């Protein structure tokens, strides 16, 4: 009898430990509140296919997936910003935004502020467009993988060193 109790307790721990739903119940409740408010469980929502899920499936590498996720999170932050005056769903949006903030930006308020600044940059403003084009070379250089540059410099130095010793 005692042995059976230990096995059942162990199985319960494994099930609860592997289930993310157990510790995230309030988060899911808030999503359910938003689904009810927007009538998002209605079958017509599926018309035209999913908005983000198919795109997420296409990206397997973690670094690539982060790029897509940043665009999706940006969309949700814009959506919540547009609905900020709606008191009926404000609490739900705040809880979900906080959870996104923790998961995507690792709780860094500096990252959140920078992320919000980027979201709010108007692309139809001529001055903004001119600044963006002016900064494009530096942005492109920043996008280049730095590890390859280091490897290239290292191999060039090794090659030069061999040539100099002959």
Swiss-Prot record:
<comment type="subunit">
    <text>Homodimer. Interacts with IFNGR1 (via extracellular domain); this interaction promotes IFNGR1 dimerization.</text>
</comment>
<dbReference type="GO" id="GO:0002250">
    <property type="term" value="P:adaptive immune response"/>
</dbReference>
<dbReference type="GO" id="GO:0005133">
    <property type="term" value="F:type II interferon receptor binding"/>
</dbReference>
<keyword id="KW-0964">Secreted</keyword>
<feature type="glycosylation site" description="N-linked (GlcNAc...) asparagine">
    <location>
        <position position="106"/>
    </location>
</feature>
<dbReference type="GO" id="GO:0005615">
    <property type="term" value="C:extracellular space"/>
</dbReference>
<dbReference type="GO" id="GO:0005125">
    <property type="term" value="F:cytokine activity"/>
</dbReference>
<keyword id="KW-0325">Glycoprotein</keyword>
<feature type="modified residue" description="Pyrrolidone carboxylic acid">
    <location>
        <position position="24"/>
    </location>
</feature>
<dbReference type="InterPro" id="IPR002069">
    <property type="entry name" value="Interferon_gamma"/>
</dbReference>
<keyword id="KW-0341">Growth regulation</keyword>
<feature type="glycosylation site" description="N-linked (GlcNAc...) asparagine">
    <location>
        <position position="39"/>
    </location>
</feature>
<dbReference type="Pfam" id="PF00714">
    <property type="entry name" value="IFN-gamma"/>
</dbReference>
<dbReference type="InterPro" id="IPR009079">
    <property type="entry name" value="4_helix_cytokine-like_core"/>
</dbReference>
<feature type="signal peptide">
    <location>
        <begin position="1"/>
        <end position="23"/>
    </location>
</feature>
<comment type="function">
    <text>Type II interferon produced by immune cells such as T-cells and NK cells that plays crucial roles in antimicrobial, antiviral, and antitumor responses by activating effector immune cells and enhancing antigen presentation. Primarily signals through the JAK-STAT pathway after interaction with its receptor IFNGR1 to affect gene regulation. Upon IFNG binding, IFNGR1 intracellular domain opens out to allow association of downstream signaling components JAK2, JAK1 and STAT1, leading to STAT1 activation, nuclear translocation and transcription of IFNG-regulated genes.</text>
</comment>
<keyword id="KW-0873">Pyrrolidone carboxylic acid</keyword>
<dbReference type="GO" id="GO:0006959">
    <property type="term" value="P:humoral immune response"/>
</dbReference>
<dbReference type="GO" id="GO:0051607">
    <property type="term" value="P:defense response to virus"/>
</dbReference>
<keyword id="KW-0051">Antiviral defense</keyword>
<comment type="similarity">
    <text>Belongs to the type II (or gamma) interferon family.</text>
</comment>
<keyword id="KW-0202">Cytokine</keyword>
<keyword id="KW-0732">Signal</keyword>
<protein>
    <recommendedName>
        <fullName>Interferon gamma</fullName>
    </recommendedName>
</protein>
